[in-house]
Amino acid sequence: MTRSLKKGPFCDAHLVKKVETAQAIKDKKPIKTWSRRSTIMPDFIGLTIAVHNGKQHVPVYVSENMVGHKLGEFALTRTFKGHAADKKAKK
């Protein structure tokens, strides 16, 4: 279920504050955040945001087609190692 339109998109205040200061001083360093739940706003375009995946901060470069999605969608939390091979097929 999507968020109600009358509520508007959610973005943590501390993240918005960091983005505004980074844009004001034209800083290209990644903005470190733990807020995976924040929606990507049009102000974020062109910035690199380091999103925490539970273990480390994954750098995410924000482009135009990411607007409206959540930051957590681009920092995967699980690593897929592959399914176990079938022993009968190897023989």
Curated annotation (Swiss-Prot):
Name of the featured protein: Small ribosomal subunit protein uS19
Disulphide bridges, residue numbers: none
InterPro entries per the UniProt record, alphabetical: Ribosomal_uS19, Ribosomal_uS19_bac-type, Ribosomal_uS19_CS, Ribosomal_uS19_SF
Source organism, top-level taxon: Bacteria
Record Gene3D superfamilies: 30s Ribosomal Protein S19, Chain A
UniProt organism field: Herminiimonas arsenicoxydans
Keywords noted in UniProt: Ribonucleoprotein, Ribosomal protein, RNA-binding, rRNA-binding
Function: Protein S19 forms a complex with S13 that binds strongly to the 16S ribosomal RNA.
Xref: NCBIfam families: rpsS_bact (TIGR01050)
Cellular component, GO annotation: cytoplasm; small ribosomal subunit
rRNA-binding found in the keyword field: yes
